[in-house]
């Protein structure tokens, strides 16, 4: 099964999306958006940019845990990964976003 996006609304009324792999694991999380349409535009940006390796910023957090950001052509962060135990597992996470990011399936959980 291929991955999908989920749009949800936080208690403060803001929206975010996540990209899930086929196994249901969250592989990318967006920032918070004031408007649902902005979150939908963020999904479109992931769909457009996820297959381009140059759009991935490979980082290491202060706690020495590797993670990555996916950036748009304008260098704005579209989504951020979880923290990984190793650079190898982070790189597998990037491959998962590349494989699942182009999916057109969006589950709207905002009710």
From Swiss-Prot:
Keyword Signal attached: no
Superkingdom, taxonomy of origin: Bacteria
Sequence repeats: 10-58, 61-109
Alphabetical list of PANTHER family matching this protein: PTHR40606, UPF0339 PROTEIN YEGP
Disordered as annotated region, ranges: 89-111
Entry-linked SUPFAM superfamilies: YegP-like
Protein name in the entry: UPF0339 protein ACIAD0721
Record keywords: Repeat
Similarity comment: family membership: Belongs to the UPF0339 family. Duplicated subfamily.
InterPro entries (UniProt xref): DUF1508 (IPR010879), UPF0339_domain (IPR051141), YegP-like_sf (IPR036913)
């Amino acid at each position: 099964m291929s991955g999908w996006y989920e749009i949800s609304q936080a208690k403060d009324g803001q929206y975010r999306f996540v990209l899930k792999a086929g196994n249901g694991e969250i592989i990318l999380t967006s920032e918070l958006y004031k408007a649902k349409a902005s979150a939908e535009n963020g999904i479109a940006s992931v769909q457009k940019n996820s297959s381009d390796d140059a759009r991935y910023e490979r980082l290491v957090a202060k706690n020495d845990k590797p993670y990555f950001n996916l950036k748009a052509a304008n260098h704005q962060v579209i989504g951020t990964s979880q923290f990984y135990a190793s650079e190898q597992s982070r790189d597998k996470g990037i491959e998962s976003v590349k494989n699942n990011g182009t999916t057109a399936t969006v589950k709207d959980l905002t009710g």
